[in-house]
From Swiss-Prot:
InterPro entries: UreF, UreF_sf. Belongs to the UreF family. It comes from Corynebacterium efficiens (strain DSM 44549 / YS-314 / AJ 12310 / JCM 11189 / NBRC 100395). Required for maturation of urease via the functional incorporation of the urease nickel metallocenter. UreD, UreF and UreG form a complex that acts as a GTP-hydrolysis-dependent molecular chaperone, activating the urease apoprotein by helping to assemble the nickel containing metallocenter of UreC. The UreE protein probably delivers the nickel. Keywords: Chaperone, Cytoplasm, Nickel insertion. It is found in: Cytoplasm. One of its GO terms (molecular function) is nickel cation binding. This is Urease accessory protein UreF. The keyword Cytoplasm applies. The gene is ureF. It holds the Pfam family UreF.
Amino acid sequence: MESTRMTRTLAAMQLMDSALPTGAFSHSHGFETYLHRGVIHDASSFGVWLQMFIQQQLTFTDAVVIREVFRSTSLKRVGELDQLITAQAVPEQIRTAGKTMGIRMLEIAEQGYPDPALIWYRREVDQRTLSGHPAIVWALVARALDVAEDEAVAQHLYATSMSLIHNAVRAVPFGQNAGQHLIRQAQEWVTAAVGNSADIEFDDIGSITPGLEIAQMQHENQRARMFMS
């Protein structure tokens, strides 16, 4: 694929847009459990959860995998990373969310940015040899377009944070201005996560705070739910 600064920017704006039809609007990644308990009750308390989510789950999973895709020298390694990021997601709803959003994003990305590695990944996912995951899809596109590794990590983490903030605005709820304030705060948390992820040993992938995963597992048995995870 031809890559210029403009094509890289526009590709990120498209694929990292919270409006991309991947189904991200239907996932809370566990914050709905904290909302049900009353731990999250306003924009400030949601911000505490979001900062933890970025520092823990996104930093030790998605960010590490994106970096590893950039450094991979074979498609076999990409396949291993797909299996690993899927297997390390202990809560079933989180595994399912990764698969469904990954498949939808892969379909869009493969049509718009048909890089050989992305075409291979689409074929493997279609054949159910691999599961599909948004972090790997974006890493393959970003690498093909010569997006800098740190920028690719930041864009994915920021996009995920944006989707969660939009979901929280309607679920908690709180106002749009409070949401914009959180988006600004999230930029600082994402910047820190990008730096921290560069120093994480690959063997530490998936080292997530147990409380976060427990809340994600408990969500499945919640009596009333707005979100699928």
